Curated annotation (Swiss-Prot):
Residues 120-179 are annotated as: Winged helix domain 2. Its main location: nucleus. GO terms for biological process: positive regulation of Ras protein signal transduction; positive regulation of single strand break repair; transcription-coupled nucleotide-excision repair. This is Winged helix repair factor 1. Keywords: DNA damage, DNA repair, DNA-binding, Nucleus, Repeat, RNA-binding. A motif (Bipartite nuclear localization signal) lies at residues 4-21. Belongs to the STK19 family. Residues 32-104 are annotated as: Winged helix domain 1. GO terms for molecular function: ATP binding; double-stranded DNA binding; double-stranded RNA binding; kinase activity; protein homodimerization activity; RNA polymerase II complex binding; transcription factor TFIIH holo complex binding.
Amino acid sequence: MNRKRRLLASEAFGVKRRRAPGPVRADPLRTRAGSAREAIEELVKLFPRGLFEDALPPIALRSQVYSLVPDRTVADLQLKELQELGEIRIIQLGFDLDAHGIVFTEDYRTRVLKACDGRPCAGAVQKFLASVLPACGDLSFQQDQMTQTYGFRDPEITQLVNAGVLTVRDAGSWWLAVPGAGRFIKCFVKGRQAVLSMVRKAKYRELALSELLGRRAPLAVRLGLAYHVHDLIGAQLVDCVPTTSGTLLRLPDT
């Protein structure tokens, strides 16, 4: 993202920066986020817990963090630090190689234990949360690592896969996963396309941010318009154009 685009994205969500005086209207999505942690805290508040019966940990996306922390290098370094400190877990969501979900570790632990309570996999899951989760912040795990370093037997690994804690990456390798996250991913992909379609169908393929957020969300947008707009800006699927009447979202030239 070039400098101009980064600055416009930060303005769209109220990240503090110096600006020339002028009658620029405040944007409806304001935040005080100045760090990756603050951005995640803001974003998880937008996550519709009730939609998933509070069975999932609140999930933010790396792309959304970029909408609030304009310098991607800084954002990535801060996310890596939070990951190394064990405060967050980063999850490969699967619909895109760059689609990374972010959850607070304690939220992840709580929801996973709840999802596996009373099931045959509970023992393997508890062992994983106690031994692997605190020691390794990686997105994926290898066969030798699981069996030799952490002492898991093949049947236990199978139980972790069945529980949704791991998903197969390739032979002898697994991604860390969130049990039941498939429902979220389905909602997210449909919602992203629906919000993009709203901008695409607008005159000149551009739409005022305030107007977009003021509209009634289509049925496909179950995660909320604000949740998706953060993603669209951070993923560079729309450009932010400041005007005297507020930020304009515009589809990039192709």
